[in-house]
């Protein structure tokens, strides 16, 4: 549906994670657009699991889209669904990536697509 609608970028949500790695990894590969996740970190090497952001140019305007998911996934869902991943704090992640984006990309506009809920408690980085 999202391909049909012509999405340019998307991000993960907790309901995507609920299906488990096999399903969300397949969904990501089936998308004709990048699924972003600046705060989804692989525990094996501490690199981002998904692309953190995507750059677009429209009518001479440079646009960066930054995507993140709630870091409450470990509180809401069993680890068997997201094993090997860590969900970093959104504010810290935004600050980190905004610095990189501003220095490297020099965008005219930054759009954040964030899937988040209410309050949560985050586990420390393993």
Residue ranges and their predicted role:
Residues 1-126:
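Acidic, metal/ion-coordinating pockets
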């Amino acid at each position: 549906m999202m391909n049909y609608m012509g999405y340019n970028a998307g991000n993960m949500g907790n309901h995507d994670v609920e299906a488990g790695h096999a399903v969300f990894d397949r969904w990501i590969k089936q998308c004709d657009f990048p699924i972003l996740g600046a705060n989804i970190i692989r525990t094996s090497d501490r690199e981002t699991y998904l692309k953190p952001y995507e750059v677009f140019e429209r009518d001479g305007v440079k646009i960066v889209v930054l995507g993140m998911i709630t870091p409450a996934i470990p509180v809401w869902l069993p680890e068997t669904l997201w094993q090997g991943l860590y969900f970093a704090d959104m504010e810290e992640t935004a600050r980190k990536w905004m610095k990189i984006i501003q220095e490297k990309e020099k965008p005219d506009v930054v759009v954040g697509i964030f899937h988040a809920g209410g309050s949560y408690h985050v586990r420390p980085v393993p």
